[in-house]
Amino acid sequence: MKSKTSFFNRTVFKKNVTLYWPIWVCYLLYGMVKVPGQLWSRLQQQTDMTAYARDYALYNSLRLEVDVAAIAIMAVVCGMALFGYLFTQKNAYMIHALPVTRGELYVTNMISGLCFLLIPQALVFLVTVVLCLLKGIASVQFLGLWFLSVMGIAFFLYATVCFCVMFTGQLFALPVYFLAVNYVAFAFSSGARYVIGYLGYGLGMDTVPEFLILRILSPMNYLYNNVRFVFRQSYNQETDLMSGVLSYRGLRVLAAYVAAAVVIYLITYYCYKKRRIESAGDLISFNWVKPLFRWGVGLSLIHI
């Protein structure tokens, strides 16, 4: 009788949840303070509970700029914890000697990390919905957009972390690789514009074209600037009242990054299947990447 092929191991998943519970608990506490906690505090400070005051308090609680940074930090921490066995040879050999396939390990750790990120977000969303209903805030559709946004951002950034994990065998190189992947294109673009603007007579930085593809290849910066809530305020002199319109932009950008994340997860799965166990402890885990790394560092130093 053939044994069934599995891509998920309950024992490993349970171990991840129980061993690394401080990670998702800390993220849950952050979410509770940042969204429902801040919203409740702002509403309590209002003496005149107008529609403008409610929407403005909701806008400040749902701002995604802080969430992008928080999700990035949590994604890196999850990657360092869940794939930590790949960074020491003793643990790498021990884990891969168990009756668990690499596919099971990868998928289980991937799902574990996503659960650490998405479940706290879901709980924060539910608590905030209840708070909005109790306080008479009708714009709950923006809570749904916030929830979709943080889920999409977490899904993509954790894919980037998993991808970076496969290319290094050192624990503290992971956050460096993650930042490099997210900002190297932006750094080269900004540096090139600065150099051209500085050396080109009569040229300013604003006159040098900025290519869209380079901005897209800097995901954190692009998400930070293009997936957000906007609150447009206006003042009516006749009624002496402030009014505001809350809106959201960036859903298509988010959908594109989520689609890219699916591809990244599949590529990472293939890389894990090909990764050498003995590369644990190496700065770069694939030999064919080492020349590219040297050239990249050299060009970066010249650029600086």
Mark where each language-model region is.
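Secretory targeting signals
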Residues: 57-60, 64, 111-174, 186-189, ...
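Long, hydrophobic alpha-helical segments
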Residues: 63-91
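Alpha-helical transmembrane segments
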Residues: 68-72, 247-263
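Helix-loop-helix units of permease transmembrane domains in multi-pass membrane transporters
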Residues: 82-118, 280
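Conserved small/polar residues in nucleotide/adenosyl-binding loops
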Residues: 302-304
